[in-house]
Amino acid sequence: RNERLFYYYIMSDLMKNIPLVYTPTVGEACQKFSMMFRRPEGLTLSIEDKGSVEECIENWPRPSDAPRVAVITDGSRILGLGDLGWNGLGIAIGKLSLYVAGAGVHPQSTMPIVVDVGTDNEELRNHPLYLGLRRPRPSTEELVEFVDEIMMKLNARYPNLIIQFEDWSSEHAFLFLERYKNKYPMFNDDIQGTGSVILAG
C-alpha cells in the first residue's frame, strides 16, 4: 500500500473524501475488520500480556520521540454498533487518519491502539476469522488494573504523547477520564470532544 498516495487522494478533496476515511465507512470496516485483515499498522495490547505491557510498547516500530498522538479503544462501544472487541482497532486507525488528512499531523506521529480484553459479542467471539481474544470481557476491577499499567508504561516511554480515549463503554469512559485527567496528557473524545464542539458553536 502507498501511504503517500492514500493521503494525497484524501486531501485532494477533503470534504468529499472524509466519509471514505471515517463515518459511515469506518463502521462497516470495523464490523468486518478481522475478515478483511490487511496488515494494518496498530498496536494491540492484550490483557493476556498484563505485566509485560512495557515490552509490547517497545515493539512499536517507531523511534521513542516519534509518536505524538495515540487513539486508544477497547472496542466496547464502536459508534452505534456496540461491542466489536479487537475489531475496534479500525476506529483508532480511522480517527488518526482524519488528524493526518485534516489537521496535518504526520502519519509517523500517530499511534492507533486497541486494548484487547475480549468481547461480550458472542457472534463475533465465535466467528472463525475473529482475530481478538475469544473470552468475555473482564470485571471493571481487572480492566482498571490493566489500563493503569498501559497508561503508566505509555507515559514512561512517550511522556509527550497525547492519548485520546475513543469509543469506550459510557461507564468506563467516565471512569477513566476521572481517573487519568489530572495525571496524564489525555482526553476522552466522546465526552470532552463533543462538549468542546458544542461550547465552541
PLM regions and their residue ranges:
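Metallocofactor- and cofactor-centric catalytic cores in central/energy metabolism, strongly enriched
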Residues: 1-201
